[in-house]
């Protein structure tokens, strides 16, 4: 085997053994020693927790107000029916949620294939039993909400957020979105030419039928690669720029009225009214200033002209005035 001792072997997909439509074994080799467990454990965790899928989240059954009740003519109690509904393997194309209906009457089993749905919905286990009707006069009708999601979301996590809007009789269901039912991996010895210290990774996986096992492996590997992309070139990691804080007020408003270079008469009148800063002045109205002793229309006109030359005017509204720096003074 040629190549530098520092080079890593690049594994290849050796074999995909399709045990059944929902069960497959995927073999990957050769791997450097230890990488079998490194990759196997990472892929296993992603396959179990991060594969998106669809699950039943809410159910409404005619004549049923809560999950701790029973329904006449139905062998199972409501809790058992909800548990059976969790076992539905549903695939939805192009939608994040759908409402399915189920209406059945007459003695016999009620199965997933009895559910009414459109072409965007596929039920992978139509023979899955939901409940049993005990006599010819028994009937059951329900509306089933199916949502797309990821991982496991217990019903208790949605109770408080939906409590005000949820009508009586709408039953929440623990949602297991992952289409992967079981995943295990093993690491065996592999050999390439004279090297016998290599790993062979065998991933044994079962799905609920809504996702092909081979496709599941590809998706998990893609997720892992995308998460590691940030480490490939750390120079691409952008350091957030520190935003320059904008002053709360225009600096000119913080300057003393003396900077306006008013006549002595006008300046003294303003100081007598405790108007020390330009920000204090612009908040006054013409009427208020005319009430100031010894300040007439001539002085008012002067003040207005000086303010206008600086893009200011009387009667302005300043939120949070005065600023802390002035208030402390």
Curated annotation (Swiss-Prot):
GO biological process: DNA-templated transcription
Keyword Transcription attributed: yes
GO MF, any single term: protein dimerization activity
InterPro entries with a match to the protein in the record: DNA-dir_RNA_pol_insert, DNA-dir_RNA_pol_RpoA/D/Rpb3, DNA-dir_RpoA, RBP11-like, RNAP_asu_C, RNApol_insert_sf
Gene Ontology CC: one annotated term: DNA-directed RNA polymerase complex
Pfam families with a match to the protein in the record: RNA_pol_A_bac, RNA_pol_A_CTD, RNA_pol_L
Keyword terms, alphabetized: DNA-directed RNA polymerase, Nucleotidyltransferase, Transcription, Transferase
Quaternary structure note: Homodimer. The RNAP catalytic core consists of 2 alpha, 1 beta, 1 beta' and 1 omega subunit. When a sigma factor is associated with the core the holoenzyme is formed, which can initiate transcription.
HAMAP family, sorted: RNApol_bact_RpoA (MF_00059)
Name the UniProt record assigns to this protein: DNA-directed RNA polymerase subunit alpha
Gene source species: Photobacterium profundum (strain SS9)
